[in-house]
Amino acid sequence: LFRSSDYMLAALASAVLPNLGVAGVRENVQASATDEAKGIDQTVIQDASGKLYDVYATDTREGRTRLIRRVKAAQTLAAARELGGLGFDMDRVVAFVPGDVSQPGQTATAQAVRQQAQAESTPLTPRKPGPTGETTVMIAVHRDGQARPLDLLTLDDCAAVGTAIGAIHRLPSTFLANAKYPVVTTGQIRSQLTVWIRRLRSAGHVPQEITDSWARIMDTEGLWSFSTCTVHGGFSDGDFLFSGSTITTVTNWQDMQVNDPARDLAWIFGKLDESHRNAVLSAYGRMMGSDRK
């Protein structure tokens, strides 16, 4: 059953790409709870030649920010040569329209300065309205697969997830540094945690025996023997798309960076029971232990 919003999204896609020739809409089986919570609608459209495209649209500030960052990440990944042979697809953006709104994330002061500069410019050039009004729209090549809640993954799904995360963590990180994404070292993580514990002690909001326990853990031998690496940034429902138990696509790379590999594994302790966690970690360990090529 198609929703009225599916046809609205198809109309927006036609406004963004008038030559696309939208012929219809398809059932969307890749809905993301995270996108929905931020006010992002999604549908699948088909053009006259049978090609499929994913269309995302939002009128909310949080949704705009998420889509803008997602597009930037997709463009960075598309330009990176290091990503060959991952074994799964990623977002491939065809078109993007940010909408006729102030830039998401821009402070009120920055907006005021921009508006003042525009007001003082002579002659005043009227701003040409965009094709989608205030609606932010992203169109991407449709990716095969179905979204699956992380807490409903099978053991085979979990093994595929562990392998995929390992493949991500083995990626050279140069492309992230070149694109100005965050690059954090192990030493910086330790320093940040040390400062955080010190501040908690000073504030007195946390019992001293707890902060003392954390400080002792910080000094545990071997705790800081890991190396930071390329990370996705943390997974939510809908970030993995599956065909059977094979991962076809990993999406939503907007938080990618060089950081603690645990960032990509933390979710398993809140979403999976022990046997499913072990399936993820075993596959991940095999991937990370294999010889680098």
Residue ranges and their predicted role:
Residues 5-20, 115, 120, 173-232:
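An alpha-helical support segment within catalytic cores of ATP-dependent transferases
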Residues 6, 10, 59-134, 150-163, ...:
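A conserved alpha-helical element in kinase catalytic cores
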Residues 17-32:
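Conserved N-terminal boundary motif of the eukaryotic protein kinase catalytic domain
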Residues 35-47, 217-263:
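Active-site acidic catalytic loop and adjacent metal/ATP-binding pocket
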Residues 39-72:
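ATP-binding glycine-rich loop module of kinase domains
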Residues 99, 108, 112-121, 132-152, ...:
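A glycine-centered beta->alpha junction motif in the catalytic cores
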Residues 243-291:
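Active-site Asp-x-Gly
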